[in-house]
Amino acid sequence: MQIFNMVSLVALFALGATAVPVSSITGVQCCQANHGDLTTPQAQSLFKSHQKRQDYWVCHACNKQFTTPAALQKHKDTVVHP
C-alpha cells in the first residue's frame, strides 16, 4: 500500500489514469486492487465525491450532526437534553 498526497491524485487524473485510489478517513491511501474496469468519467466522479466530503460535528447527547462548530454550539445552548 502506498500513500498519495492530493498532488499525486491530481497528477494521476491529468495523465488519464484509470486506477482509482481508495481513501480512508485517516488519510489518503492507495489500494492496489485492480480498478481497470472503471472508465475515466467514473474515476473522475469518485474523485469529485471525495472532494465534497465535509467534516461534521456531533452532539453526543442526541447524536445529531452539524456542519459547523457554531451550529453545534447553538444547538447545545438552545436544546435541553435529558
UniProtKB/Swiss-Prot annotation:
Its main location: secreted. The keyword Phosphoprotein does not apply. Residues 1-19 form the signal peptide. It comes from the Eukaryota. GO terms for molecular function: zinc ion binding. Keywords: Host nucleus, Metal-binding, Secreted, Signal, Transcription, Transcription regulation, Virulence, Zinc, Zinc-finger. InterPro entries: Znf_C2H2_jaz, Znf_C2H2_sf, Znf_C2H2_type. Probable secreted effector that translocates into the nuclei of host cells to reprogram the expression of targeted genes by binding on effector binding elements in rice. This is Host transcription reprogramming factor 10. It is found in: Secreted; Host nucleus. A zinc finger (C2H2-type) spans 57-81. GO terms for cellular component: extracellular region; host cell nucleus.
